[in-house]
Amino acid sequence: MREVAAPPETVFAVLTDHRRYSELTPLRKSVLEREGEPAPNGVGAIRKLTAVGPALREEVIGYESPGRFSYTLLSGLPVRDHVGTVELTPNGSGTKMVYAVRTQPTVPVVGGLVVAVVKQAVKGLVDGVVKESERRTAAGG
């Protein structure tokens, strides 16, 4: 759980701007391969994210502005049933962000490593989203 000094609308806008992830997070490249509904970054959108190693392809499966966003991993890690969900709730003048990931490594021997990589990736993403959301709020936008 993270406290963000920005309203949920701002945090949601930053969180779901897939094309800008490489500017805000440790990702080297972020591409929107397919647009979704009701917005380009909405349900059905497919994003390709590259840090190190193989690119991750994820599909947006939940887009409820400004409170909830979720995705599933299509390829890039030896896992199955990988779903990430971010819930944003108003908290005073800011936002409480809860980011949860459910995943099942397919190769037990490297399962611990996969979980560690996922945790580090989520931390980098959350840190970038929080920083940009707070920057926008402080700048009045």
Task: Name every feature range the model reports, one short phrase each.
Residues 79-85:
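Amphipathic hydrophobic-ligand
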Residues 3, 48, 72, 87-89, ...:
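Residue-level recognition of well-ordered beta-strand positions that form the cores
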Residues 1-35, 96:
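Hydrophobic ligand-binding cavity/cleft-lining segments
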Residues 3, 23, 32-77, 128-141:
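Glycine-rich portal/gate segments that line the openings of hydrophobic small-molecule binding cavities
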Residues 5-9, 61-66, 87-96:
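A short, structured loop/turn motif at beta-sheet edges
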Residues 65, 76-78, 91-93, 104-106:
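Short coil/turn motifs at secondary-structure junctions
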Residues 102-141:
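A conserved amphipathic terminal alpha-helix motif
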